[in-house]
């Protein structure tokens, strides 16, 4: 029985002494990988085709308004507010490219994180300061991805909200103008 306890203690000591010195960094990389995965899923839920269709509709509506709206008539305040809100759709022209660029950045960062994790698990990095530097660089990269992903998500939600509330009003103006002129 004494030999079993001594053997178990030696085995536990051996496991603890041989554990990876970068366990904390490996855990941090795992968290970063989860964050990047969440950003990727968030982006995949954003419909760039829907945004493109909103922009096309904006162009059609505004073309009719510019052509048929009488400039010297008194513009009611509601129309002015709605038209200003609707301009936000026009500003979203770079949405699709922004989404695609961020997805490329995510793919690159996922590879970098996987490589860093492998290097840490295999103890291929000999210096803890170097490991900390690499981890800090990847943390910065992931934080930038999170900021841009949240901004794209917020912009998408705003666009959908504007389209849902303002587009019907603007379309009714277009319909009225088409009937009059």
Language-model regions, residue ranges each:
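Generic signature of mature, soluble extracytoplasmic domains
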Residues: 63-66, 70-111
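C-terminal motif of bacterial Sec signal peptides marking the signal peptidase cleavage site
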Residues: 14-17
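Extracytoplasmic electrostatic interaction patches
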Residues: 95-181
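Short amphipathic alpha-helical patches
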Residues: 59-67, 78, 82-85, 126-129, ...
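Sec-dependent signal peptide recognition
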Residues: 2-11
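Non-membrane alpha-helical secondary structure
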Residues: 43, 47-53, 57, 87, ...
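Immediate post-signal-peptide N-terminus of mature secreted/exported proteins
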Residues: 19-83
């Amino acid at each position: 029985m004494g030999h079993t306890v001594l053997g178990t203690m030696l085995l536990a000591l051996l496991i603890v002494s041989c554990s990876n010195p970068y366990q904390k960094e490996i855990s941090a990389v795992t968290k970063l990988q989860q964050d990047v995965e969440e950003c990727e899923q968030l982006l995949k839920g954003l419909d760039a085709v829907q945004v493109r269709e909103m922009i096309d509709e904006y162009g059609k509506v505004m073309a009719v308004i510019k052509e048929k709206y009488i400039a010297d008539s008194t513009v009611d305040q509601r129309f002015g507010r709605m038209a200003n809100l609707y301009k936000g759709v026009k500003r979203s022209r770079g949405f699709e490219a922004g989404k695609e660029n961020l997805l490329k950045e995510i793919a690159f960062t996922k590879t970098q994180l996987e490589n860093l994790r492998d290097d840490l698990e295999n103890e291929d990095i000999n210096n803890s300061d170097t490991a900390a530097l690499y981890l800090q660089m990847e943390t910065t990269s992931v934080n930038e991805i999170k900021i841009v992903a949240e901004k794209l998500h917020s912009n998408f939600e705003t666009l959908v909200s504007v389209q849902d509330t303002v587009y019907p009003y603007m379309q009714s103006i277009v319909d009225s103008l088409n009937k009059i002129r």
